[in-house]
């Protein structure tokens, strides 16, 4: 880690400021008790930036992010900006340009079900009795979402539309290397998801992944067609470690994995470029319906910070301690409203304080 690590904090909209406040408590612990030299700078993004600075992604925010080592993001968007043209809404005008500006080609979505929370999963109890821990590694800049040509045609009283799935070899190589490197620090298993029995792009995908795998003989590689993968995740999620996916398939599979954990309020995510610059954010949205009620689950934001510490700072032991602090609080039965089956639940700040105490005291 650098002597002085700079983090751009973008709280954003909805519950973003509330959950970010709890993550900032963890940052303060890292400075005071773990003696990390951290420089925290806060900037506007999303709807709040529109209100304060006139645009969803102000130049000051972009410059601040450029001068940082990592970005910690809350959430953007909400119903109050739905009256704006689509291209000016916070989600479109802030997140997409931010990801594009930093060439974030990969997205990591952990989907972990703690045994203590297995009752939340929609899957049968015998399937999730031991929990599961899956990491979805999704290619973020190629594939059918960005392939050209694409279009919508209304001609001779007939309508048709078309999209193009394109993958370049280098795009597959770099995402495959990332997946295998991540697997080395986990259970050393990569399952690559494709549709190579139908799609030419998937034939290349499988061919390239196989080639890259030879450089990681200690990691076991398997392949599944996307339809079978969707079934297997429901049937036995614990069989998986790292899932390597194209843009489209990763979009679908990561949401499926998130759903079977029972609460998206528990799930962090990270996106990287080739220089390992990262954007870390909760997998969920801005949840404007519970904004200001102090009932949002801050765990996804705190675990996003843990990912920043692990992958951005390369401080695995400290990240492990943050993860353990969250786990310890859950083991003791503490819950926020989204993961509680009764009215006996903690407020956002109370959950944050308990995790802070657990991190400081190691219990």
Swiss-Prot record:
Subunit field text: Homodimer.
Record localization: Cytoplasm
Residues at which Mg(2+) binds: 227, 251, 255
Keywords: Amino-acid biosynthesis, Branched-chain amino acid biosynthesis, Cytoplasm, Leucine biosynthesis, Magnesium, Manganese, Metal-binding, NAD, Oxidoreductase, Plasmid
The protein's required cofactors: Mg(2+); Mn(2+)
The protein's role, per its UniProt record: Catalyzes the oxidation of 3-carboxy-2-hydroxy-4-methylpentanoate (3-isopropylmalate) to 3-carboxy-4-methyl-2-oxopentanoate. The product decarboxylates to 4-methyl-2 oxopentanoate.
Principal subcellular localization: cytoplasm
Pfam family, one: Iso_dh
Organism: Buchnera aphidicola subsp. Acyrthosiphon pisum (strain APS) (Acyrthosiphon pisum symbiotic bacterium)
Gene Ontology MF: a single term: magnesium ion binding
InterPro entries: IsoCit/isopropylmalate_DH_CS (IPR019818), IsoPropMal-DH-like_dom (IPR024084), Isopropylmalate_DH (IPR004429)
Catalytic reactions on record: (2R,3S)-3-isopropylmalate + NAD(+) = 4-methyl-2-oxopentanoate + CO2 + NADH
Family matches, as SMART domains: Iso_dh
Family according to the record: Belongs to the isocitrate and isopropylmalate dehydrogenases family. LeuB type 1 subfamily.
Co-factor binding comment: Binds 1 Mg(2+) or Mn(2+) ion per subunit.
Protein name, as recorded: 3-isopropylmalate dehydrogenase
GO annotations of cellular component type: cytosol
Keyword NAD annotated: yes
Documented EC number(s): 1.1.1.85
Domain of life: Bacteria
Residues annotated for substrate binding in this entry: 99, 109, 138, 227
Gene3D superfamilies in alphabetical order: Isopropylmalate Dehydrogenase
Lineage: Bacteria, Pseudomonadati, Pseudomonadota, Gammaproteobacteria, Enterobacterales
Site-annotated residues for Important for catalysis: 145, 195
Gene that encodes the chain: leuB
Chain residues that bind NAD(+): 78-91, 285-297
BP GO annotations: L-leucine biosynthetic process
UniProt pathway annotation: Amino-acid biosynthesis; L-leucine biosynthesis; L-leucine from 3-methyl-2-oxobutanoate: step 3/4
């Amino acid at each position: 880690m650098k002597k002085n690590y700079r983090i751009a904090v973008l709280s954003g909209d909805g519950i973003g400021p509330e959950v970010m406040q709890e993550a900032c408590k963890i940052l303060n612990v890292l400075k005071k008790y773990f003696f990390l030299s951290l420089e925290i700078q806060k900037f506007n993004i999303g709807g709040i930036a529109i209100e304060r600075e006139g645009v969803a992604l102000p130049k000051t925010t972009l410059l601040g992010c450029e001068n940082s080592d990592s970005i910690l993001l809350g959430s953007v968007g909400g119903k109050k900006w739905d009256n704006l043209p689509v291209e000016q809404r916070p989600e479109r005008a802030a997140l997409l340009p931010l990801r594009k500006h930093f060439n974030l080609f990969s997205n990591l979505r952990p989907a972990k079900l703690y045994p203590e929370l297995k009752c939340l999963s929609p899957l049968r109890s015998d399937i999730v009795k031991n929990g599961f821990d899956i990491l979805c590694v999704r290619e973020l800049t190629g594939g059918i979402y960005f392939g050209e040509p694409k279009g919508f045609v209304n001609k001779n009283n007939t309508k048709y539309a078309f999209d193009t799935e394109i993958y370049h070899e280098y795009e597959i190589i770099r995402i495959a290397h990332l997946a295998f490197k991540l697997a080395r620090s986990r259970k050393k298993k990569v399952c690559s998801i494709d549709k190579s029995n139908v799609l030419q792009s998937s034939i290349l995908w499988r061919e390239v992944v196989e080639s890259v795998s030879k450089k990681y003989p200690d990691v076991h590689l398997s392949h599944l067609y996307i339809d079978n993968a969707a079934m297997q995740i429901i049937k036995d999620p614990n069989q998986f470690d790292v899932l390597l996916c194209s843009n489209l398939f990763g979009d679908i599979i990561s949401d499926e994995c998130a759903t079977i954990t029972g609460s998206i309020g528990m799930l962090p995510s990270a996106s990287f470029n080739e220089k390992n610059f990262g954007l870390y954010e909760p997998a969920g949205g801005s949840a404007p319906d519970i904004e200001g009620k102090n009932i949002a689950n801050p765990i996804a934001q705190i675990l996003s910070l843990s990912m920043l510490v692990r992958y951005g700072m390369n401080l695995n032991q400290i990240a492990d301690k943050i993860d353990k602090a969250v786990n310890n609080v859950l083991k003791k039965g503490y819950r926020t409203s989204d993961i509680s089956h009764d009215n006996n639940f903690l407020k956002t700040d109370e959950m944050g304080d308990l995790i802070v105490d657990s991190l400081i005291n190691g219990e």
